[in-house]
Amino acid sequence: SHKVSGGLHGVGVSVVNALSSKLQLTIHRAGQIHEQEYQHGDPQYPLKVVGETSTTGTTVRFWPSGDTFSQTIFNVDILARRLRELSFLNAGVKIVLRDERVNFEHIYAYEGGLSEKSALDIAGLPGKLADCQEKDPALSELYLVEGDSPGGSAKQGRNRKMQAILPLKGKILNVERARFDKMISSQEVGTLITALGCGIGREEYNPDKLRYHKII
């Protein structure tokens, strides 16, 4: 069921190794080239020095195990979506996707990361937000209402001093299951992020900037 990961966070190459019939590591570090090979998760020899280098970096090559996967052909569309998400999250990192089967290459690089994503307009509050007069987040409440009609009724019956109303169109996207790029391109999600005021992403998110301490 896991299309782009082994299912766990923070395990990296160990999961890839366990799911591969063969894995090769080539490490450029401290002027030396180190190499090690695994087959079905087992090391074939200790890490060894095979040459000299003036660069740094690591190359990982792996062959998915036919004993684990019914199909071992890589789907470039799935890889492209995942790498695009990673490029949004890691500003300044260049990721190159190359498919030598069809002579395809694409480079993903977002210098500003999420801060440049046009889907999130953080210049001002959403137009449909009926904000409250209270400026202290601890005393402010935000009510999320489905649809414009219920939103209008809620605006009329609210306490303007401490209650804000934000109408959202239909059922909001399930962000727990959605791809990251699809999530931040959703107008309703973008509106909600802007209204809350605490941003999104590793560099931008700050819970201290949350504008409402009670959200209903």
Curated annotation (Swiss-Prot):
The record marks K171, N174 as: Interaction with DNA. Transmembrane segments: none annotated. The gene is gyrB. SUPFAM superfamilies: ATPase domain of HSP90 chaperone/DNA topoisomerase II/histidine kinase, Type II DNA topoisomerase. Its EC number is 5.6.2.2. Gene3D superfamilies: 3.40.50.670, Histidine kinase-like ATPase, C-terminal domain. This is DNA gyrase subunit B. It is found in: Cytoplasm. It comes from Acinetobacter sp. (strain ATCC 33308 / BD413 ErpE27). The keyword Nucleotide-binding applies. PANTHER family: DNA GYRASE SUBUNIT B, MITOCHONDRIAL (PTHR45866:SF1), DNA GYRASE/TOPOISOMERASE SUBUNIT B (PTHR45866). GO terms for biological process: DNA topological change.
